């Protein structure tokens, strides 16, 4: 509806006018998450935190300062990854939810939208129940063990240097040994291939 906006999360960081589309919106949906690492994360972190005024700029107009209350929902076959931000702040702002693989025997329901529309009152009650729980938890989401595992796996997957250092075929830690950085770098580049 009017309170939502469809956009690429990558565009929020790479296009200076993109944040203007999020003004007065409650949710932004990226329905096909680009697997390219985000070059920056400053805008996304500021929007998610919703405590800092941001520069909202429209083409051919004076930029203004404003608060954006939008929340991001990103769907994809991978995780949101930052090229240069490995801070806790980037990761702690994410809740990673996985879904079951599609059953090969599943038959798609062509009437799913109609059936869900009929269930709107029940879905609304379900959402209000979740809102009451969120308020009772002082605006802290309940994070499932699976979501914690998903986040830990995403963090490990994005940290290839640690993975390299744990690759025993390339790196061995023994007392009283040393190696030249050029040899270590060659081993790292070979491991990356």
Predicted regions and their residues:
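Feature primarily recognizes SF3-like P-loop helicase cores of small DNA viruses
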Residues: 1-193
């Amino acid at each position: 509806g009017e309170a939502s906006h469809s956009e690429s999360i990558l565009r929020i960081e790479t296009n200076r006018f993109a944040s203007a589309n999020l003004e007065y919106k409650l949710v932004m949906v990226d329905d096909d998450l680009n697997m390219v690492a985000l070059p920056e994360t400053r805008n996304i972190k500021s929007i998610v935190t919703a405590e800092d005024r941001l520069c909202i700029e429209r083409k051919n107009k004076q930029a203004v300062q404003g608060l954006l209350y939008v929340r991001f929902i990103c769907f994809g076959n991978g995780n949101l990854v930052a090229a240069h931000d490995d801070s806790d702040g980037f990761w702690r702002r994410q809740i990673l939810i996985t879904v079951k693989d599609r059953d090969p025997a599943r038959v798609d329901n062509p009437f799913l939208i109609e059936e869900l529309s009929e269930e709107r009152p029940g879905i609304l009650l379900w959402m209000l129940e979740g809102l009451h729980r969120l308020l009772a938890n002082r605006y802290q989401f309940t994070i499932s063990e699976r979501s914690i595992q998903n986040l830990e796996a995403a963090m490990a997957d994005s940290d290839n240097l640690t993975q390299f250092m744990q690759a025993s075929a390339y790196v061995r830690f023994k007392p009283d040994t040393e190696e030249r950085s050029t040899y270590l770098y060659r081993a790292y580049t070979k491991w990356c291939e």
